[in-house]
Amino acid sequence: FKDNLTWLKLNRVKPQAVHDLYFSTFTIKGSSAAYPSSIRFDNYYHSGTIIRSEDNQLTPLIIYDGEALDGSSANILINNIASGGTIPSQLNDKLSSFILRRGHMATLAVNENGTGYSKVFIASEEDLEVHSLPTKLNNAVSVIRVIPWNVVSKIETGGDIAGMNNSWFYRWNNLGVSDVQREYVPMSWGKGGADDENDIQNYRSKYKTTHILGFNEPDDCNGQSGQYNNMCDPEVANGFYENLMKTGLRMVSPAGRQGAALDWINTFNQFAIQND
């Protein structure tokens, strides 16, 4: 690979097989590839792989202060939190349009800490051009995070179980690690995984992770996460869930018991909408 935006897509060879059979054949800008420091083997649905360089100097997002990709512009580094005055070219609260290069995900939010109104944009297989931001984001973005997008299938496991032919897994906690074959999706089981800056830094540091799961059965006031710290109150849970927005990851709602979607989750969602 000579260009850090180039990729090789194999539709029917899984990441582990690519790593084991072909790893030694790849070079990055003339040097032998080193996994995971200079090369990535990302999932491509159930049976494929996207191979590309791992380069922290890559700038897959170009932002503009005018609509239709016009006006002053700035390049945003991958795997970096750009917020407030650290957004280049003095474009804090001035973003109106952007180009996101294929294979990447960008999270934009209005508050410098990542909370408040936000939106995740995904350029899965083609560059994404947004010529006009949604009204609530236009000239209001104060934090940006761009990370590699990983295209997993629907097949997953609850638990780090080998040999299940899945492309992602979770463990009801935030202690897991992705491997070459699977993306690990951390869960904030309860309040303890969402109440301080160390939690946020932990989630941000997860290699290959694009999502974070909300709380485990917070609707159960007598069991699971809902029995602790008044988490079965949807408003209380919403406050800690908001803290997870600081990760810049794509967020998944809390997982309630059967029937919670019509009651607890609905109430939780209404609080989230009210609070942006």
Language model segments and positions:
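Compact beta-sheet-dominated domain cores in extracellular/mature segments
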Residues: 3-155, 161, 176-178
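A general structural motif
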Residues: 5, 23, 152, 166, ...
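Active-site-proximal beta-strand/loop segments in catalytic clefts of secreted hydrolases
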Residues: 66-67, 111-112, 157-162, 170-175, ...
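Alpha-helix termination/capping residues and helix-transition junctions
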Residues: 92, 138, 163, 206, ...
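Structured segments of extracytoplasmic/periplasmic soluble domains
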Residues: 101, 112, 215, 243-247, ...
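N-terminal carbohydrate-binding/catalytic regions of secreted carbohydrate-active enzymes
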Residues: 152-212
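Noncatalytic carbohydrate-binding groove/subsite architecture in carbohydrate-active enzymes
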Residues: 176-198, 232-276
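Glycine/small-residue-rich loop that forms an oxyanion/phosphate-binding "nest" at active or ligand-binding sites
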Residues: 210-237
